[in-house]
């Protein structure tokens, strides 16, 4: 049984000019231990879908489960089974790495001694063990992203949602984070749901891709299968396939007027 399953997932928003259909019936699955890339141009519905799957937004149609827990009937169960790393992160710049990790563990009701042990375990596993007593404000961009991911893994989730995890990182830090994501999957069997605007990243990391546009799924499959089916020539890139499917290039970096 897929660890993540959505059927007809939809979300509308009322506006002064009428109802906006941000997501119009998305079907998708992710298997245990799979890295699933979720792609689409700005306004395609990626953000809305991710917010629904992480219980931050209630669907107006369809159903979805995470680790067998229904988004609407059991949102607490979904949150117990999920880790979520937002694009902007969320660390307190005035505390140490250790304090941030312990606080996160305590939020998941770990005892003080267990929380301290879990903080050290996460730091060792994610290359932060030499930084435990550093203030988070002094960390590099790559180190902060590792801390964000460590916080998302505190409660050993079955599914880890990563929203644009390498945005703003230099090439070396991006490569390091790619390797970390692969290792998390390999060592723990964690399912990773990855949104990204970097098509080289999706090509390198994802076992399978779901591409959406205008609130619906327009294609899914392995990166190689999508390139063969939609890029139009041998040796074509994932970007060629993406352009053919959506009629637009990767969304520009930086804020958009309305992210749905």
What does each model-found stretch correspond to?
Residues 102, 106, 113-131:
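Conserved ABC ATPase "signature" region
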Residues 135-139:
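Conserved ABC ATPase signature
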Residues 156:
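Conserved catalytic motifs of ABC-family nucleotide-binding domains
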Residues 160-163:
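Catalytic Walker B motif of ABC-type/P-loop ATPase nucleotide-binding domains
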Residues 220-221:
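ABC ATPase "signature
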């Amino acid at each position: 049984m897929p660890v993540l399953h959505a059927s007809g997932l939809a979300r509308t928003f009322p506006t002064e000019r009428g109802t906006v259909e941000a997501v119009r019936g998305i079907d998708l699955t992710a298997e245990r231990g799979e890295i699933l890339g979720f792609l689409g141009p700005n306004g395609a519905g990626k953000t809305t879908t991710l917010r629904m799957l992480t219980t931050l937004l209630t669907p107006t149609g369809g159903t979805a489960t995470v680790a067998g827990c229904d988004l609407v009937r059991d949102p607490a169960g979904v949150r117990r089974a999920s880790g979520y790393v937002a694009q902007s992160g969320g660390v307190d710049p005035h505390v140490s790495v250790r304090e941030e990790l312990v606080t996160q563990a305590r939020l998941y009701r770990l005892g003080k001694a267990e929380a301290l042990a879990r903080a050290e375990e996460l730091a060792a596993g994610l290359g932060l063990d030499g930084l435990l007593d550093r203030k988070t404000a002094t960390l590099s961009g790559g180190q902060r992203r590792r801390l964000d991911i460590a916080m998302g893994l505190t409660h050993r989730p079955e599914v880890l949602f990563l929203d644009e995890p390498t945005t703003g990182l230099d090439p070396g830090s991006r490569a390091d984070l790619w390797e970390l994501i692969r290792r998390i999957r390999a060592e723990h069997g964690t399912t990773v749901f990855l949104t990204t605007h970097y098509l080289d990243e999706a090509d390198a990391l994802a076992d399978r891709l779901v591409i959406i546009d205008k609130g619906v799924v327009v294609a899914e499959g392995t990166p190689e299968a999508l390139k063969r089916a939609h890029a139009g020539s041998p040796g074509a890139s994932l970007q060629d396939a993406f352009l053919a499917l959506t009629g637009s290039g990767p969304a520009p970096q930086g804020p958009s007027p309305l992210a749905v």
